[in-house]
């Protein structure tokens, strides 16, 4: 992290992973622990939503955010978009909670049994030791991340084509996708209007392309060292890598917010409520419901779209903050300058 030529910076507990920035073993342990917490939240909140679910009220009007996703994936849904079986939701919640325990055990193992620094490890683990200015090793680690992301995209393809199918709002039922779109002109033609996709074939075909491209990129980064132009263009430091990551998350958040707000194929009306409209409150944009609901109630679509939008906004601020620090900008100088102005006035 940026220390402004002070190598003895001490980070308190609230600084998170900055405490382990130069300890690759503990850094991995922290990441596994965060994955455990995320998975625990997913499982526990699925159960919480299941305990509050009312079969006589439209799912999109109950303020749920996880059960609609599971229904869209075709779990527990019958003809007409009716929820006919909630047991799959219970099982999925349980699997996530069990997985969180396994991940938590892995985090404890890395923290208390593994080496603090992977350069002291033996065997294959030593290969994953990294330094923030080592572009080659960062490329290797990036490659492995891309492999997992690609596998995740292809899992959706497998669910759509082989494991029961997805919910199709155009026929109000779950169906298997047998002929995904593979025409690259159709898939890449969505670049300017991606949120207008209106058929599962294009959605599944897009995931095939994304999954394969991610896997190809993963293999590339594992086998090929960063090229000269990339080393010249990019800054390789903990602060810079963090800023790149936050920028990517911000972009994904803005895309998800817009897609969720307007698209009714990936976010069916039956489970999320009708599309939203953009409104402004004292120049601040937000997505508003287009149906009348009791005071204080909002559709699942409104919750998801607005949450993604505002979180993406703050991730963008984090990206800019850390990007400026990565190039050497010291925010303390701003504070000192303002204090000097106040003193002189």
Swiss-Prot record:
Reported cofactor(s): chlorophyll a; all-trans-beta-carotene
InterPro entries: PS_antenna-like, PS_II_antenna-like_sf
One MF term in the entry's GO annotations: chlorophyll binding
Reported induction: By iron-starvation; however compared to Synechococcus PCC 7942 and Synechocystis PCC 6803 induction is very slow.
UniProt membrane topology term: Multi-pass membrane protein
Protein role: Functions as an antenna for photosystem I (PSI) under iron-limiting conditions, when phycobilisomes disappear. In the (PSI)3(Isi3)18 complex most of the harvested energy is probably used by PSI; in other PSI-containing supercomplexes a large part of the energy will probably not be used for light harvesting, but rather is dissipated to protect the organism from light damage.
Quaternary structure (record): Under iron-starvation forms a complex with PSI trimers, where the trimer is surrounded by a ring composed of 18 IsiA subunits.
Protein name: Iron stress-induced chlorophyll-binding protein
Natural source organism: Fischerella muscicola
Gene: isiA
